[in-house]
Every structure is written in C-alpha cells, then in structure tokens.
Amino acid sequence: IMIYDAHCHLDLMDNMLEFINEIQNSDMNLFAVGTTPKAYSREIQFCKNARNIHVGLGMHPQLVSSGYDDMQLFKSLIEKSHYIGEVGLDFSKGYIQTKELQINIFSEIVKLCEQYSEKVISIHSLKSTSTVIEILRTYKRQKSNKYIFHWFTGSMPQLEKAIELGCYFSINPGMLKTKSGMEVIKAIPIDHVLLETDAPFA
C-alpha cells in the first residue's frame, strides 16, 4: 500500500535531514510544500536522491511582503517545477493589509501554471476562499493541472463551486476535530479527497 501525504512542510521540521533519510527508504510519498522560491532551491538539493519526496515551488501568501517574495526567481523556476505550493491567499487579521499584493501574485502564479500545464498546485485559502475560486474561475483552463485546496475552511456553497471547477481537497487531523471540518469532509466526492499531515503544524 502506498501512503501519500499531500501537504507537509519538510523545510520547517527541526530534524529535516533525518526525516528525509527515513522517507526515502520507505513506501511513503509526500508533497513537500515550500514557502519561498529560495527555500525551494535549497530543498531540491536536500531531496535530490529521494524520488518519493516531491518538492513544491512555493510563494506563501503570509510572506508576500517579507522580502522573500521573489517573483522573478519564481518565474525562472516554474517551468521545470511539477509541484507548486504553498501558494494562495490569506485574508486573516494579520495579513489582510497585503490583500491586493496577494491577489496580484496568486493570479500571476495561476496564469503561469496554466501557461505551462501539468502542475500540481497546493492552495492556502484562509478567509479568502471566494477570491481564490474567482481567480481559478477566471484563469483555469488546463485540465492537466490539479488544484488542491489545503485544509479547506470555506462554506458549503463555496465547496460546491470548487468541486465544479474540478478541484481536489487535502484533509488533515485538524479538520476531524471540528463540526464544520467534518461536514466538509463528508461532502467531498471520494475521488477528490487527498490526505495531508500539514506537519509540523497539524
């Protein structure tokens, strides 16, 4: 049986190198999402011998004005990057002030993914689900791209819209602890469900 973790933060683990060694000798596959383009370049080197670790080219919405939001570097790497994430929007209290910049960057990332195709994209959508869906509806054309909502926290009508767009959903233990999380899980078609740990957070 192959186990697949669709969203974890390998680069944020205290024992990253030890964990990489364990994973590459196991039957487990994982999508190691990144937070910045610079982190991606470093993590690719650490995981170059681990065929079952798929490193994501990320631009986390919480970091878009931190000095690490190097879109030029992102653009130079995306063509050869099959896995994209963590990307998306975060309109929670601590990050709402960068809302317009987040929208511009995420829109650009989706357009780039549509240009190159064959991408697997892990999306952060905290308190911003409707805008994420609007952007996907505007630019999503390639059937070969797989858009995954990580830890979906939107409403049921928003979930239905995301399903209509062909999106996937990675669920984690944190979602099992809330009534709304359980309702979301029950409503997702089984062939659109993926599992994630969100390690080291969930």
Give the ranges of each region predicted by the language model.
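Mid-domain alpha/beta scaffold segments of enzyme catalytic cores
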Residues: 1-202
